């Protein structure tokens, strides 16, 4: 298998560039620790209370409703109540198998 001189040169240049980028990231991390990390930025963001309240409401609905008697009991998460279970409408082969199982 023969490689041209140009392809070997390009591979070498790209490898060196990758090592330089990784070195810069590592250097930044060693200097600043987690303070420069994206996870640290997300942790410091204020909590959106409206979103948290909506999620808490859905969670309460799911916990309080073990079975369903109508589509309203599914807390708006799945479209239909089938045989006492909130079942999503899935198309294709998987939907057919789920439909027969329920």
Curated annotation (Swiss-Prot):
A Pfam family (short name) is: Toxin_23
Which residues comprise the propeptide?
24-56, 100-102
ATP-binding as a keyword of this entry, yes or no, is: no
Tissue occurrence:
Expressed by the venom gland.
Keywords carried by this UniProt record: Amidation, Calcium channel impairing toxin, Disulfide bond, Ion channel impairing toxin, Knottin, Neurotoxin, Secreted, Signal, Toxin, Voltage-gated calcium channel impairing toxin
Q: Where in the cell is it found?
A: Secreted
Q: Which residues form the signal peptide?
A: 1-23
Q: Which domain of life is it from?
A: Eukaryota
Cellular component (GO) terms are: extracellular region
- Disulfide bonds, which pairs? 61-75, 68-81, 74-86
SUPFAM superfamilies in the record: omega toxin-like (SSF57059)
Residue ranges annotated as transmembrane are: none
Q: Where, per the database record, does this protein carry Leucine amide?
A: 98
Which GO MF term does the entry hold, naming one?
A: toxin activity
Instruction: State the domain notes.
Output: The presence of a 'disulfide through disulfide knot' structurally defines this protein as a knottin.
| Record family assignment | Belongs to the neurotoxin 15 family. 02 (omega-actx) subfamily.
**What does this protein's UniProt record list under function?**
Potent inhibitor of insect, but not mammalian, voltage-gated calcium channels (Cav).
Can you say what this protein is called?
A: Omega-hexatoxin-Hi2a
Give the organism the record lists: Hadronyche infensa (Fraser island funnel-web spider)
